[in-house]
Amino acid sequence: PGYYNKNACKKIEEICLTFPEKEGMVQDTKTGKINDTINKVRRSKVRFINLQDGDFLGSHELYTELTNLIAKINKDFFHFDIKGLDSIQYTEYDGSYKGHYDWHTDWNWSNPMNPPRKLSMTIQLTDGSEYEGGDFEIAHDIEPGYEPTKQLGTVIVFPSFMPHKVAPVTAGLRKSLVVWFTGPKFK
């Protein structure tokens, strides 16, 4: 079983669904500008959990929980200088439109964000039996078909500079929570 149980995943989803839905977008690596017309790279629906919009159903507690979780994971595995949380994004990839996100990094080296994203976290909110396709892959690490990444409640954390992707969902609906943690530039 994953780190989060079914009830915890349902609670996370309830919090996320109180925020407005948007089309997933891609940042142009040359200009740094948001490009919402790149469908071949990314097709998804997203909701950003923004504390400035208010505390809906416990979004403040969710921020606290995720911050505490990354502190433990970072201490045990990465030892990065983490100072904050960039944002929380709830993402849906639907088989009806072949939802996907092709190879990308969460850190843009040619147009660095300030502060830079250092660790990326994804939490699986849908059990793999509820959709087809949609494999989460990390270059040179997690390969297609690695079943533990599809277990409900699974948490995956990796350096934001590592290329990763979500393969097209061919049937059903894949839901996940993505969180980016920031800190000073790498030395």
Residue spans for each PLM region:
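Non-heme Fe(II)/2-oxoglutarate
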Residues: 1-78
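Catalytic core of non-heme Fe(II) oxygenases with the double-stranded beta-helix
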Residues: 60-187
